[in-house]
Amino acid sequence: GCGKPFCFNTIMARLRARGKVVLAVAATGIAALQLDGGKTVHTGLRIPLDPCGNRRGIFAIPITKNSALGRLIMNDIDLIVWDEAPMTHRDIFDSLDDTFKKLRNDSRPFGGVSIMLGGDFRQCLPVIRRATCAQQTAASIRHSTVFNAFGVVHLITNVRVELCKLRDPSRSQKLNEWAEELLRIGDGEYLVNESESSPFESRLPAIVHSKAIETKDDVFSMIYSLFGDLAELSTMDPRELIKQEAMYSAVLCPLHVSVDFVNRCC
């Protein structure tokens, strides 16, 4: 919530207005949609997909000198903006570094191409199937051979929280506690035995206490317990709807298949 996409888009708009060539990519499609002209890194930089997770070490990236992307990288590119970079495997980073050096015949990191990374190492790391903590950490771009070439700038103001506080000043204290608690979780400082003083609230429906959620009826009961009558909520004035407890509730699912099941039921 610190406004990374806003910063990226502002910088890109300024550079493009001056005639500079900026390529915007992101590790995920959702993150790419938040960038002006953004693409996934696999589309924008021709990174081959590795759905089985069998790839290891530096690999070939199919960018040739005669291709449009190759000519762009060799001659025209001024900046690459790369959002959610911590989700990227270090092998992708090292392979791109190797490819750019060969394309540009330049031994500097990434062949001298300026790259701006964005992301939060407290959040998602590369997805490694059945990995240990050590393997997960080793896959991070922080262990890339070129990571030390980057300077680091920290965004420390949670803009999303500040905007919420402006809309509802009465919730300022609770929002501040919530933001601080998130940082503590990300930094590994959250202790389970402190849960009684946590600003997080869990409202488990009675059905969750008594049985597993397995059928459509179970899902309907859970949704009704948490959110009430959805048909009634859909007809409410937005100014009244924002005051409802349902607006600050969520159903957390451990697996994608669970999310799909709940969505199909609703």
Model-derived segments and spans:
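RecA-like helicase/translocase P-loop NTPase motor core
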Residues: 1-266
